[in-house]
Structure formats: structure tokens, C-alpha cells
């Protein structure tokens, strides 16, 4: 009898929860239509995985890619609509958030074809891999639109949990297990620090959790210049710092890049930075409105350390993935310049434009690493010597992406950095921009060193890995080449049409 009563209560409670969720989706679903499309795609993947004995692999890739493309389409149709706040103030939809959501969806869409051949060769579980990628994408999108401290904490946890699982996906690889352990420990510590900072904001504002209400609460309690706000700023900066991985919060980055599966590294290297940048701009710009001088100083220190340490240490690396890890630390220093400049002098527009170019440059380089690694089994920079003699397309596309990362004209990376530095110069960040220019010159050195190895034709310098290199038939690697071609085009041609791209970003944001 007691069991029946408990069972009935459980059913009633479950029904109430379901009806409440259905009510929220019914009245707020249009605000999160792109996210709902991804959720529907996740459900489809789970249904196919649980009902089909023999997995129809092309269908799994098709459903994942289609849900991402449909989500992008839904975002584009909603472009330039009036800002909306939904779910009792927890989620905000506006042009600024949607641009970052578009960038995250673009990253995921390019990463799936980049992963196809790698998954087939390493015999990784396909469905789970795609589920984790889509769920991480969903978490990143919710983080971009988060409008309160609870959602800002929960959404990155959704992203981070999937990231931990993806980084340790090759369970038999000792390096992958080591990378996952370090990533998990650092991620857990950063989340604890972040939520501690939010608790100081919560108390100082009189119990408010919405970003704008926190500002109003600080005004009402007269706590906006209190030591508690300074403590909150330090803890939140440290917490976000571990997500963005600028120096000195970069310790996990090289090991995770080196030990994780290469398609996973490609995915994490761009999506995590886009989502964390979107969150950082909103957190610093709204709740810490009265502490702008303090957080500007903190971010300037992080940017300087990142640009110097990232680019100098990258010179000494022998692993291609570790080199890109330190390069990404330097790149986030450039992005921080745009965050500091903010709305004034088109800082956000230049930051978003540079991140768009960075996605194509970085993913194009990782596509080369995936393709070369599958055919040679090595990641050592020296082993790339003479690749042009065996695979001219791979060598040339790699060279273009690396030159664009270094910021050489007339490629997209040059114009992206130029506009970002110009906005910083107009905002009076002379020392920061000077450091950025000097470290960009340093980065060109180690990128050109790799390109020289790729293009060498001396037999004595060509390693056995390249001598035994065999190109696979087009049918087997066309998915990687598709991603690479898209990334190479996006790393070169947009630089010529820089003004229209900046104009679109400015028109959309303001």
C-alpha cells in the first residue's frame, strides 16, 4: 500500500515537472528556437542509437550536421529583432548574443566533417561523440544568452562536462587520460572560484541574480565601491580566466591540446573561447559597471602576459598541437584588447570579426594536423619536412592558414589584427597595442619556420614519415578536405572585403 502511494506521488510530481517544462517551452520556445532544434537533433540521435542494431553511420552525421545548419538558419531569420528576455529573466536574446551563438554553431558545423575520418580510423564510438559535441554546443549557446548568475554557472558546466568526456575519449591512450584528469581538476577548481565570486555579488546586491538587477541592487545598497565588489571581481576574473586560458591561467591548455584527440582539440580550441568571451563581456560590462577601471587593469595584465608568454614559449615547442596551444594563449591576448575597448571605438565589432577569422585559421590548421596524423601517426613539427613533395594541397593550405594566423597581408588575419589594434590605439591602449604588434612579429617567426619545413625539397631533411606518406583516395578523406577548403577560403578572401564585414558587425551590434 505504501509503495503504491509513493509510486503515485512520484508519477504526479513527474507529471507536474513535465507540464511545467511544456508550459515554458510553449510560451518561451520561440525565444530559444535554435537551441530547441539542437535538442530535437539530440533526441533523434538517441532514438536511432537505441533502436537500430546496425548503426547507419552516414545518417548520424547527416542528422548532426543538419540540426546545426537548421539552427544557424533559425538564428539568421531572427537577425536584428528586438531584444527579448525570457524564462523569468534567465535568458536574453539580442544581436550581441546571437552573433556569438552563430560563431559557436559555425565551429561545430565545421568540426563534424573534420572528425569523420578520424573516428573511422580510431574506431571511436560515433553516436556518443556526436552527442557530446551537440550538447557542448548547446551549453555554449545558453551561456551566450545567460542573463543571471545561476545560468552563467550552469551553462558552462554543461559545456565543460562534455569537454572532459571528449578530451578523454580515447581511453586506452595514457596521454588522453592525463589530459582529462588535469582538465577536470582545473575545471572543477575554476567553477568553484567562479561561484564564490558570484556569491559575493549576490550578497552585495541584496540577493539579486539577474545581471541588470545586480547593478540596481548595488546602487540601492550603496555597495558598488565596497571591498566585497573587489573580491567578487578578483574571483570571477580568475574563474573566467581558466575558461579563456590566458596566462597565468593556461597551465591545463598545452597538456589537454597534446593529449586529447585532435578533432576534439579543434572543437575546444575555438568554441570554448567564443563562449567564454561572450560571457566575459557581459559580466564585466554590466555587474562591474562601477569598477571599469579595476577590471580594465586586470584584463590588461592578462592580455600582456598572454601575448608575451604564449608567443615566446610557442617558439620552443616540438609538438604541433602544443605549439598551437601556446599560440592560442597569445591569440586570446589579442581578443582581450577588444573586450577592454568595449562598445566605444568599435571594440566589440573588431573582436567579433577577428574571432570569425580565428575560427577559420585555427580549424584549417587543425584539419591539416588531423589529415597528416592519420597517415603518419606523428605530431612532431620536424616530421612535416618536405610535405609539399607528397601532398601539395595539404602543404599549401596549411601555409595559408599559418600565414593568416601570423597576420601577414593580404590575408584575413592581417586585417583582423589591424582593425583590432587600431581600435585599441584609438581607445588609448598604446602600451597594450605595442606589445601586441611586437608579439605578432614573434609569432610570424615560428609560423614561417613551419612553412619552411613544409616546403623543403632536400632529401636529407625529409623524414621517413613523409617518404612513406600515401595520400588516401578522395572518397575517403573528402570530408576533411571540405572543412580545409572552407577554412582556407575564409582565411584569405575575407581580408580583401574587410570593410563590409566590419560594417555588418557594427550595424548589427549598435
Curated annotation (Swiss-Prot):
Keyword terms = Chloroplast, Membrane, NAD, NADP, Plastid, Plastoquinone, Quinone, Thylakoid, Translocase, Transmembrane, Transmembrane helix, Transport
Q: Which GO terms describe its cellular component?
A: chloroplast thylakoid membrane
Where in or outside the cell?
Answer: Plastid, Chloroplast thylakoid membrane
TM helices/strands, residue ranges: 24-44, 57-77, 99-119, 124-144, 150-170, 183-203, 229-249, 295-315, 323-343, 347-367, 395-415, 418-438, 484-504
The entry lists its GO molecular-function terms as: NADH dehydrogenase (ubiquinone) activity; quinone binding
**Main location group:** plastid
State the annotated membrane topology for this chain: Multi-pass membrane protein
EC number(s) on record?
A: 7.1.1.-
**Annotated GO biological process:** ATP synthesis coupled electron transport; photosynthesis, light reaction
Which top-level group of life is the source organism from? Eukaryota
Q: Which InterPro entries match?
A: NADH-Q_OxRdtase_suN/2, ND/Mrp_TM, Ndh2_N
Which catalytic reaction applies to this protein?
Answer: a plastoquinone + NADH + (n+1) H(+)(in) = a plastoquinol + NAD(+) + n H(+)(out); a plastoquinone + NADPH + (n+1) H(+)(in) = a plastoquinol + NADP(+) + n H(+)(out)
| Protein role | NDH shuttles electrons from NAD(P)H:plastoquinone, via FMN and iron-sulfur (Fe-S) centers, to quinones in the photosynthetic chain and possibly in a chloroplast respiratory chain. The immediate electron acceptor for the enzyme in this species is believed to be plastoquinone. Couples the redox reaction to proton translocation, and thus conserves the redox energy in a proton gradient.
On subunit structure and binding partners, the annotation says: NDH is composed of at least 16 different subunits, 5 of which are encoded in the nucleus.
HAMAP family hit by this protein: NDH1_NuoN_1 (MF_00445)
- UniProt family annotation: Belongs to the complex I subunit 2 family.
Q: What is this protein called?
A: NAD(P)H-quinone oxidoreductase subunit 2 A, chloroplastic
Organism equals: Ceratophyllum demersum
The organism that produces this protein has a lineage beginning with: Eukaryota, Viridiplantae, Streptophyta, Embryophyta, Tracheophyta
